[in-house]
Design a protein with these regions (language model features):
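Class I S-adenosyl-L-methionine-dependent methyltransferase catalytic core
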Residues: 1-220
Length: 220
């Protein structure tokens, strides 16, 4: 490589930090799509599209899948049994619910805000971790080799017990055959706080994670 090529390469390199500050995911997701795929992706699946907030203002062509027809997704279906042929996507995006149930406050629509279409019961530890393996198997199937899976995941405290959702997700991905390649910590402006809370036993969550998996034995 010539000196000119080396200089040009160094000028093109833009550092991508592991901590992201901001409320919106759309800009961060655009950075992920520009940074991790081997080539500019054209076949993208959002497997938990909900109202499509990740893609507002984007020019990318994205197929949205959701189990709830009220969100009017392009494809209505279960991401644990996807209606797609194997190896047809370059990127899959996944944002599972992390809050186990609506609670008593019915003034807020948790389905729209958090994708909460179903409850998680005591049998499952008030967690959705039991849904990760089936999704991971399907994501692995529909991704092409070297394809990338972007997962947004938040840990949760329920009944004074910390639920390590991001660790459960990583384990599920690795058992399926994915390589967990990177992690972005997304920090919000402030924690979610209920004015009725009087006593705290854990710190309040001000962050979530974007975990990057690749359908490969290597990351680079």
């Amino acid at each position: 490589m010539s000196l000119a090529e080396q200089l040009d390469s160094s000028l093109r390199y833009q550092p991508f930090g592991s901590v992201w500050y901001g409320e919106e995911d759309a800009e961060l997701l655009e950075r992920l799509l520009s940074f991790y795929p081997r080539k500019p992706p054209e076949r993208i699946l959002d497997a938990t599209v909900n109202g499509g907030r990740f893609w507002r203002g984007t020019r990318r062509k994205v197929i949205g899948l959701d189990i709830d027809p009220r969100h009017q997704p392009a494809v209505c279906g279960d991401n644990a049994v996807m209606p797609f042929r194997s190896g047809c996507f370059e990127v899959v995006v996944y944002d599972p619910p992390h809050i186990p149930n609506q609670g008593r406050d019915r003034s807020k629509d948790f389905n729209t805000r958090f994708g909460l279409g179903d409850r998680s019961t005591k049998e499952h530890g008030y967690s959705f971790a039991h849904t990760y393996p089936a999704f991971m198997a399907e994501a692995y199937r529909v991704l092409e080799d070297e394809g990338v899976l972007f997962c947004k995941i938040a840990d949760y405290v329920h009944n004074h017990r910390y639920q390590w959702a991001h660790i459960e997700l990583i384990h599920a991905g690795q058992k399926t055959g994915f390589t967990a390649c990177d992690c972005i910590i997304k920090v919000r402006k402030g924690p979610i706080i209920d004015p009725n809370w009087k006593v705290a036993h854990h710190t309040r969550r001000e962050h979530c994670y974007w975990i990057i998996f690749r359908k490969s034995h290597r990351c680079e």
